[in-house]
Amino acid sequence: MTLQTTVADHFALRWRASSWLYDLTLILSGSLFIALCAQIAVPLPFSLVPITGQTFAVLLVGALYGSRRGAATIVAYLAEGACGLPFFAEGSGGMIALLGPTGGYLMGFVAAAYLTGWLAERGWDRNVLSTTVAMVLGNAAIYITGLAWLSRFVGTDQVLALGFYPFVPGAIVKITLAAMILPTAWKFLKR
C-alpha cells in the first residue's frame, strides 16, 4: 500500500511551512481542540466514565495529522492535563485523572491517534467505509486500554457494563460524524 498525504501534509506542502514550527503549531492547536471537545461531557449516573467529545477529537486529530503528529499531539495533551490544566473531561486535570478510573482511556488515546493516523496515511480517510473502519479500530485501542485499567477499580465482572456498553451509542454517533467529515474534507481539498 502506498503512503498518501494526510490533511496536515496537504497544507504543509501548499504553504511551504517550516517543518518544526508547523508541527509545533499543529500539536498545540490539536491539544487545545481535544481539550475543548473534552468539555462536551454527558455524565452517566451508573458509570465512573462520562461520554465526551474527547474521543471524537482524538480520532479526528489522528486522521488529520497522521501517525507521528497525531500521537505527539496526544502526548502533549496528556502532559498538559497531567500538569494540572483543566483539559480532561469535565474540567479535570492533574495526575489523579491519569491514575484514576479514566486513566486507561486517556493512555489509549496515544495508540488510537497513532493507529488512525497510520491508516489515514494509507488512504483510509478517503471514503466513508474505510474511514468508519479506521475509527472503529481507533476506538478499539481506547477501549482495550481503558477497560483493562478500569477493571482495577470496578472488577472484571462489571467492567463491560460500566466502561463499554453505555458508550457504544455515543461511539456510533462520533464514528458516523468522522466518517462524513474526513471524506468530505478530501473532496473539498481536491478542488
Regions flagged by a language model, labelled:
Residues 1-31, 162-191:
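Alpha-helical transmembrane segments and their cytosolic interface
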Residues 2-71:
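Hydrophobic transmembrane alpha-helices
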Residues 2-16, 22, 36, 95-142:
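Short helix-perturbing small/polar motifs within transmembrane alpha-helices
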Residues 26-37, 58, 62, 73-81, ...:
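Alpha-helical transmembrane segments in multi-pass membrane proteins
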Residues 36, 40, 64, 90-91, ...:
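Helix-loop junctions at the membrane-solvent interface of multi-pass transporters
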Residues 40-114:
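Alpha-helical membrane segments and adjacent membrane-interface helices in multi-pass membrane proteins
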Residues 64-68, 115-123, 185-189:
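Structural signal for the C-terminal ends of transmembrane alpha-helices
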Residues 123-191:
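Membrane-embedded alpha-helical hairpins and interfacial helices in multi-pass inner-membrane proteins
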